[in-house]
Curated annotation (Swiss-Prot):
Keywords: Chaperone, Cytoplasm, Ribosome biogenesis, rRNA processing
One Gene Ontology cellular component: cytoplasm
Comment, domains: The PRC barrel domain binds ribosomal protein uS19.
Domain PRC barrel intervals: 102-182
Protein name in UniProt: Ribosome maturation factor RimM
Protein's UniProt keywords contain rRNA processing: yes
UniProt-listed GO biological process terms: ribosomal small subunit biogenesis; rRNA processing
Originating species: Yersinia pestis bv. Antiqua (strain Angola)
Family statement drawn from the similarity comment of this UniProt entry: Belongs to the RimM family.
Oligomeric and partner information: Binds ribosomal protein uS19.
Disulfide bonds: none
Subcellular location: Cytoplasm
SUPFAM superfamilies attached to this UniProt entry: PRC-barrel domain, Translation proteins
Keyword match Cytoplasm: yes
Organismal lineage: Bacteria, Pseudomonadati, Pseudomonadota, Gammaproteobacteria, Enterobacterales
Amino acid sequence: MSKQLNPAVPDQPIVLGKMGSTYGIRGWLRVFSSTENAESIFDYQPWFIQQAGKWQHVELEDWKRHSQDLIIKVKGVDDREAANLLTNCEIIVDSTQLPALEEDDYYWKDLMGCQVVTTTGYELGKIIDMMETGSNDVMVVKANLKDAFGMKERLVPFLHGQVIKKVDLTAQRVEVDWDPGF
């Protein structure tokens, strides 16, 4: 693992995955990827982690698929004990590396914190998380404190055209055709 801050720390950091448990005795680690295709996480370099509030560059020596898992070998990490120190570290890259999206496609990171409002003007709350369900993505919306329907959280499908009527990332606003009581 490189102790240098070279390459530069990401200006626009985004978490693409997480280092999991150790694998074997030679310093390998499992990796949990948040990219659509799990192996795509290796297309984005350099990797960084934060430990005790400090950025560290992580240089990969090797990676491979093992059964259903992805495992990595980090340069300079040669035993289980050293690898154990990296367990649960988030894998961070600069978001400027992500490809441009087509119209009506959004990165989840860009939707976080957006206010969700119905077509009738009712404020449902803010997006705090996104979930993948297989058939479609779902917004997890934290309701406003004084929600008229007593809701704390809502799950709203991210179906463009059907439910999602307008997304304005500049205004941090998503307009939906959704019953606030549901």
